[in-house]
Amino acid sequence: MLRPRFNYDVIKEMMDYANLKVKEKQEEAKKYSLMHTSLLIVISNYNSILYGNVGNTRFYHIRGGYIVSQSKDDTIAQLLVDEEALNVSDMKFHRQRNDLLQAIGDFGKIKPNIIKSPVELMEKDIFCLTTVGFWENIDEHDMENDLSRFEDKKQWLNSLEKRILASLRDNIENYTIAQVEVQAVASPEPMEKDRSKLIKKIILIIMIVVVII
């Protein structure tokens, strides 16, 4: 079985690379100068997952039919929620729900929202990776209720799409949802530490020893 690298730095490296490539595209032609995008990355070692996002994509973790956690985004509305100036239930309708504080393609460095500790998997866990057009038009309770009604996950997704299309909004943003269900879980392994950082620490220790001697 393949054992991919599994740590915080892997996601950060991929985010930085994506940001670099989008900025390179911006410089190719004037028509791409305003190009920006949101990004959500999930990695796994077959026992746990780590995820991170930039922009207004969203990640949902469903266990036992209920949403047990979801990611935060980089919108002004989310900032207001974090500062307790806005109720989370009102976020979907706030006029600044799509005003981003950062996105892939921004000048300078980005600061991805990456969880610090891995989430241990359980069989039948469900993960949903979505764009803003999905989450701003779907209530989390409706996601749970529809899931309880349909054993077939395709029917569940179809029911959610119908809810989006029935939205009363004048304009519906691009809506995308990718759903993953865990069928089996591997035995646990320790999270791999970044080897390059370890080498730098070893070199630094050697240099200090040499100086002291």
Predicted regions and their residues:
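PP2C/PPM-type serine/threonine phosphatase catalytic domain
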Residues: 1-213
